UniProtKB/Swiss-Prot annotation:
Pfam families: UbiA. It is found in: Cell membrane. This is Digeranylgeranylglyceryl phosphate synthase. It comes from Haloquadratum walsbyi (strain DSM 16790 / HBSQ001). Its cofactor is Mg(2+). The chain crosses the membrane at residues 21-41, 42-62, 96-116, 133-155, 162-181, 214-234, 235-255, 266-286. GO terms for cellular component: plasma membrane. The keyword Lipid biosynthesis applies. One of its GO terms (biological process) is glycerophospholipid biosynthetic process. GO terms for molecular function: geranylgeranylglycerol-phosphate geranylgeranyltransferase activity; magnesium ion binding. CDD domains: PT_UbiA_DGGGPS. It is a multi-pass membrane protein. It is an enzyme of class 2 (transferase). Its EC number is 2.5.1.42.
């Protein structure tokens, strides 16, 4: 295999951001488990997880295509700016991944398929229309991230499970916080491209205050399952540290936005683990 082919394959792999795609699949599985415990249908959950991974990878690829000019400034080592994959190649590859995602949904209940189609439309709308609008792009990304949990629950026919709904809200709010901080980090490149992100429109300090306020709502929401008795003390022992990690992340964000984003992401995954443990304890009768 020659160097050019290896470089293209590496570029395609980087374009998918496999770590993020697999993480989204894990969140979908988490949603199914929180909603149904151990009584889940393997084929449905597998289809939902596969669809999430393919759709997330496709979304990353198409997002990089539309962001190719901005990434020359903000992230020059991404596959398209560094020349690892062509613009046309990125479009074709993302189309292949979207088809794989659609095929994966064929085993799912109708409600899950409808949710998948809604998310696909939201993703396309985000990349082509709303990404540069203040708050709107952040809200769409927040919804899409949180909806991975709903999708897992929908795959087993339990999309209205209260625990999953709270998890959706928590993840969406935490993601909104992270997206605003990311916009602060990308301020220079976004301004040069004429985007109207929240920090550009209202200023960095007000945007940071909005991000902090949104996260505080998420922290309050995370306690609700314990307060109303859905999950017990084992849930609380994990979700409180998760909240602390996210709060530290937003506190560090003004001085180190990259570190703040990483802590917010880690805190969200710890919170997801808290929901898994909370459901497992209930199912086991501990």
């Amino acid at each position: 295999m020659d160097t050019h082919v290896r470089g293209t394959i590496r570029g395609a792999i980087d374009l998918m951001r496999i770590g993020n795609a697999v993480a989204a699949g894990v969140l979908t599985f988490t949603g199914a488990f929180v909603a149904g415990g151990f009584a889940v249908t393997t084929a449905h959950v597998t289809g939902a997880v596969a669809a999430t991974i393919f759709a997330t990878a496709a979304g990353n690829a198409i997002n990089d295509y539309f962001d190719r000019a901005i990434d020359k400034i903000n992230r020059p080592m991404r596959p398209i700016p560094r020349g690892a994959i062509s613009e046309r190649g990125a479009i074709v590859f993302s189309g292949f991944l979207f088809v794989a995602a659609v095929v994966s949904t064929s085993v799912l209940p109708l409600i899950a398929i409808v949710l998948a189609l809604m998310n696909l439309l939201a993703l396309v709308a985000y990349t082509e229309l709303f990404k540069g609008l203040p708050g709107v792009g952040n809200a769409i990304v927040a919804y899409l991230t949180g909806s991975t949990f709903l999708f897992g629950a929908a795959a087993i026919g339990r999309i209205t499970d209260f625990g999953v709904v709270v998890l959706f809200i928590l993840a969406a709010l935490a993601t909104a916080t992270r997206e605003i901080i990311k916009d602060i980090e990308d301020l220079d490149g976004d301004r040069k491209e004429g985007l109207q992100t929240l920090p550009i429109v209202i200023g960095v300090t007000p945007a940071y205050r909005v991000a902090t306020g949104v996260l505080l709502v998420a922290v309050i929401a995370s306690i609700v399952p314990y307060v109303i008795g859905i999950f017990g003390i084992w849930y609380l022992t994990l979700v409180v540290p998760a909240d602390m990690i996210m709060l530290i992340g937003v506190w560090q964000a003004p001085d180190n936005p990259t570190q703040g984003q990483q802590l917010l992401k880690r805190g969200m995954f710890v919170a997801a683990a808290a929901f898994v443990v909370g459901r497992a304890v209930v199912v086991a009768g501990i």
